């Protein structure tokens, strides 16, 4: 799984995920499924905001990177992936500027068009189950929730999907591709099932020549929002390196 992640995700996303796991004492060599899940979630957050801007009339428009109007205001502020202190600084700044209610938990994005924070979810289970879990945790009608699955399903607060159909299709296609690539490598079952994950882990440890008695317990702790290696204040180049291109999974 670790090799798969390094091959199929943008190197910067991989580095951010590594730093997030290290900060919380999680070993990516052991918790490879969590490593893959963190990378997937971060990529979806960036794809969610890709090419979406707000013009002078306050209208949401889609602009390609090489467009001369790329200096328009970004529609979405990316909070996920920042250092925790920086993330709360950005959230507080947004609340002070827009009058938005401060969320109890760090959200993933802020939508300047709809003036609301957004919580993004990527699940390997039924979307409605994961949606309810998110809603019960957040307990706030002010934070908009949008859940994606690897099967192309999605669910959002009040069926308001925020993005246009084409933008959402890009995310769904990427998730489906990740699932297919995992399946072709025999990794999907272990990614979905904890029992299969333990079997795969033992197999990986043996193949690496490690002691058969090495610990195989997978931590149940949930990592908070990803921690980015440096702040990205809102400007036209803040996510250029990530938006330039997402690496495609090489053929098996």
Swiss-Prot record:
Cysteines engaged in disulfide bonds, as pairs: none
Site feature location: Important for efficient shutoff activity: 28, 65, 202-203, 206
Keyword annotations from UniProtKB, A to Z: Decay of host mRNAs by virus, Eukaryotic host gene expression shutoff by virus, Host cytoplasm, Host gene expression shutoff by virus, Host mRNA suppression by virus, Host nucleus, Host-virus interaction
Key word Magnesium present: no
GO molecular function, one term: RNA binding
GO terms for biological process, alphabetical: viral RNA genome replication; viral translational frameshifting
Pfam families documented for this protein: Flu_PA (PF00603)
Family (UniProt): Belongs to the influenza viruses PA-X family.
Comment on protein domains: The probable endonuclease active site in the N-terminus and the basic amino acid cluster in the C-terminus are important for the shutoff activity. The C-terminus acts as a nuclear localization signal. The C-terminus is recruited to host protein complexes involved in nuclear Pol II RNA processing.
Name of the protein this chain belongs to: Protein PA-X
Encoding gene, per UniProt annotation: PA
């Amino acid at each position: 799984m670790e090799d798969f992640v390094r091959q199929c995700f943008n190197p910067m996303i991989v580095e951010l995920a590594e730093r997030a796991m290290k900060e919380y004492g999680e070993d990516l060599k052991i918790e490879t499924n969590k490593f893959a899940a963190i990378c997937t979630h971060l990529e979806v957050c960036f794809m969610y905001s890709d090419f979406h801007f707000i013009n002078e009339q306050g209208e949401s428009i889609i602009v390609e990177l090489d467009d001369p109007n790329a200096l328009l205001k970004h529609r979405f502020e990316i909070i996920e992936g920042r250092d925790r202190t920086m993330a709360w600084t950005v959230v507080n700044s947004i609340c002070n500027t827009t009058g938005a209610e401060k969320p109890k938990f760090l959200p993933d994005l802020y939508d300047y068009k709809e003036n609301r924070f957004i919580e993004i979810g990527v699940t390997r289970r039924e979307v409605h189950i994961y949606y309810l879990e998110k809603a019960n945790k957040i307990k706030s009608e002010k934070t908009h929730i949008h859940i994606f699955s690897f099967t192309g399903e999605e669910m959002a607060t009040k069926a308001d999907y925020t993005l246009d159909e084409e933008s959402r299709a890009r995310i769904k296609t990427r998730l489906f591709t990740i699932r297919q690539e995992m399946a072709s490598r025999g990794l999907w079952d272990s990614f979905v099932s904890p029992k299969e994950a333990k079997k795969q882990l033992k197999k990986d440890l043996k193949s690496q020549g490690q002691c058969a008695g090495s610990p195989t317990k997978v931590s149940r702790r949930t990592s908070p929002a990803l921690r980015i290696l440096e702040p990205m204040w809102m400007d036209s180049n803040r996510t250029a390196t990530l938006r330039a291109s997402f690496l495609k999974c090489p053929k098996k």
